[in-house]
UniProtKB/Swiss-Prot annotation:
The keyword Transcription regulation does not apply. SUPFAM superfamilies: Glu-tRNAGln amidotransferase C subunit. This is Aspartyl/glutamyl-tRNA(Asn/Gln) amidotransferase subunit C. Keywords: ATP-binding, Ligase, Nucleotide-binding, Protein biosynthesis.
């Protein structure tokens, strides 16, 4: 698949991005390389392969949830320039 200006404009609009004119050719080249790589992956014959969710027999081992006290809020708020209780204090911007 060739990435042309029309497709790049559509992608630019859908992604809400603005691409500089200097970067357009480079972006088109990179997108073409990505699409070519995906095309190669799509050509692989996987009909004889069985779908695998996990390579570990019995699935992924999970740890038990262990409740413990956390000091994360205080750790984060100690770097705040201003705080009120467990909240950041910021200037009022909406009346």
């Amino acid at each position: 698949m060739q990435i042309d200006d029309t497709l790049l404009n559509k992608l630019e609009k859908l992604s809400a991005l603005q691409i500089n004119d200097e970067k357009r050719e480079e972006i088109k080249k990179q997108l073409s390389e990505i699409v070519s790589f995906v095309d190669v992956l799509n050509e692989l014959d996987l009909s004889s392969d069985e779908a695998v969710v996990s390579s570990i027999k019995g699935g992924t081992p999970l740890r038990e949830d262990e409740p413990h006290l956390s000091n994360v809020v205080d750790e984060i708020l100690k770097h705040a320039p201003s705080r009120e209780g467990h909240f950041f204090a910021v200037p009022k911007i909406i009346e």
